[in-house]
Amino acid sequence: MPSRIVLIAFSLLACASVFAEPKEDALAAYQKFFDAFTTDNHDQIVRLFAPDALFYGTRSTELVTAPEGIRAYFVEALSGKRGSVKATPFEQTALVLSDSVVVISGKWQSERTAEGKMVTAGPSRNTVVMQKRGERWLIVQFHNSPTPKPAP
């Protein structure tokens, strides 16, 4: 009987480890943005956003509220002339609001080769709201802005 209890306990623990917490799921889904950013695949990036997402890119002058606008932003920003690209998030903090909503704030920077030289853009500040819709975590709010220089 005790061995049966141990077996059941291990089975339950194994099942629990299969299901990640909302924080880890949302962070993993958001990492896909950085992976896609390096590919110049605009459609892949847009698929990470909810159809009703609110979007402020670094160069956005107005709030973007449609997938076509988000795609247009990345078509312009990711012109394919960037050479090899690396996108690195850091200092990320996640706040779980519910089982299906997580806010992530942090910084990130991109590095690319241009004319044989490494060029770094950033670090930028970034805040996103991730929402689980069905089985997918999607970006429902995105705001990116340059990090201000410290006061002298």
Where is each model-derived feature located?
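Bacterial N-terminal signal peptides that target proteins for export
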Residues: 1-7
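A solvent-exposed, acidic/Ser-Thr-rich amphipathic alpha-helical stretch
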Residues: 23-24, 42-100, 119-121
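Solvent-exposed loop/turn segments at secondary-structure junctions
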Residues: 52-55, 60-62, 109-111, 145-149
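Beta-strand elements of well-folded, non-transmembrane domains
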Residues: 110-114, 130
